[in-house]
Amino acid sequence: MVNPYRDELEGDYKIRTFSEDVSENELIWHRDRNDREITVVEGAGWQLQMDNKLPEDLQKGKLYNINKMEFHRLIKGEGTLKIKIWEK
């Protein structure tokens, strides 16, 4: 399976880019192997939904914590989404 994003390493973090052309069907529920902190660099209207919670609008500059092995997914917004990811 091909990932619906592109990663670029930038020192101690990576920039993950989701194209505006990504299909909503590719943005599946999943779990990560490590704890992560993310923040939005670019994008509007995208949402993060954690397991058993309502979707939350992603706000540029706000820090979001994602615990390892916790189910979550992105919900597509408008345009491209770029997030900065720190693995813990």
Describe every region a protein language model picked out.
Residues 51-70:
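Short acidic-glycine-tyrosine-enriched beta hairpin
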Residues 49-52, 77:
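Short strand-coil-strand connectors
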Residues 13-33, 65-68:
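Conserved short histidine dyad/triad with adjacent acidic residue
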